[in-house]
From Swiss-Prot:
Keywords: Host membrane, Membrane, Signal, Transmembrane, Transmembrane helix. One of its GO terms (cellular component) is host cell membrane. It is a single-pass type I membrane protein. The chain crosses the membrane at residues 41-61. This is Transmembrane protein B66L. It comes from African swine fever virus (isolate Pig/Kenya/KEN-50/1950) (ASFV). Residues 1-20 form the signal peptide. It comes from the Viruses. It is found in: Host membrane. Residues 62-66 are cytoplasmic. Belongs to the asfivirus B66L family.
Length: 66
C-alpha cells in the first residue's frame, strides 16, 4: 500500500468515526445509535461505510482521478 492509499484510509477512518457522521448518517438507521453512541449494529454500519468509501477512493486512485 502506498502512502496515498494509507493517508486516504486514515482520513476516511477519522470521518466514519466522527461524531458528525454518527449524528447525521448512522443515526438514520433504526437502533444504530443510543445516547449519541453507536450500538453494535452502528459499529457494523461504520465498518461497512468505511469499506465502501475506501473501495471508491481506491478506484479513483487507480484511475488517476485522486
Amino acid at each position: 500500500m502506498d502512502i496515498k492509499r494509507a493517508l486516504i484510509l486514515f482520513l476516511l477512518f477519522l470521518v466514519v468515526l466522527s461524531n458528525a457522521f454518527v449524528d447525521y448518517i448512522i443515526s438514520n438507521f433504526n437502533h444504530a445509535v443510543t445516547c449519541r453512541k453507536p450500538t453494535y449494529f452502528g459499529i457494523v454500519l461504520q465498518g461497512i461505510f468505511l469499506v465502501i468509501l475506501f473501495s471508491i477512493a481506491d478506484y479513483l486512485i487507480n484511475e488517476n482521478i485522486l
